Amino acid sequence: MRTIDKRIAPNVRLAATLVARAPALTLAYDARCKSRLAATLDTGEDVALVLPRGTVLRDGDVLVADDGALVRVAAAHEAVLLVRAPDALTLTRAAYHLGNRHTPVEVGAGCLKLEYDPVLADMLTRLGATVERASAPFQPEAGAYGGGHRHGHDATFAEDYALAQQVFDEHHGHSHSHSHDHDHDHDHDHDHQHGPCCSHGHHHGHR
């Protein structure tokens, strides 16, 4: 069995005909996140994938086997949700909640794509988005996913969070409640501009 152990850097240009002749390794997103994997090329050949830990393969990547042969990566069709909305605010709220759950998302023009999840589909529908189940390649945004942070002047935070928590509780049959006390007080005044829609001073009191 051949071992595939190298990925050619994306900035290295290869002849298109050379890449086109290479056998394809077609994988869903979850499999493309694994650095150790037993897989089958589109030719029917079984191979072992042994890449540096933390490697996430993307559609179009070119790999090198231990015999020097090239293998091209293709994103497989898989069950996904296509999320659209009647306005930018609704789509932004949808993206916010998905990011708050560290959900991998592929961002398109006026559309979000994520792996199929009935709980998330329900939540997104209640937020006012249109959710369509489909079969398509999935290639989410690359980068680190961080936790969300609540801001006191986010006027819709409480409403959005309550809706998301309600959906989660209905699907999982229980709720989790976390309370955090902070023993510090500080006030600060500052003027800042948010853009053409906001230009005013704010006084924040945090407790």
UniProtKB/Swiss-Prot annotation:
Q: What's a single GO BP term from this record?
A: protein-containing complex assembly
Could you list this entry's UniProt keywords, alphabetically sorted.
Chaperone, Cytoplasm, Nickel, Nickel insertion
**Superkingdom, natural source:** Bacteria
What one GO molecular function would you report for this record?
Answer: nickel cation binding
Q: Where is the composition biased (Basic and acidic residues)?
A: 170-194
Question: Where is the region Disordered?
Answer: 170-207
SUPFAM superfamilies in the record: Urease metallochaperone UreE, C-terminal domain, Urease metallochaperone UreE, N-terminal domain
Q: Which GO terms describe its cellular component?
A: cytoplasm
Q: Where in the cell is it found?
A: Cytoplasm
Q: What is its main location?
A: cytoplasm
Q: What are the disulfide bonds?
A: none
As for what it does, the entry says: Involved in urease metallocenter assembly. Binds nickel. Probably functions as a nickel donor during metallocenter assembly.
Query: Family per UniProt?
Result: Belongs to the UreE family.
Instruction: State what protein this is by name.
Output: Urease accessory protein UreE
Q: What is the lineage of its organism?
A: Bacteria, Pseudomonadati, Pseudomonadota, Betaproteobacteria, Burkholderiales
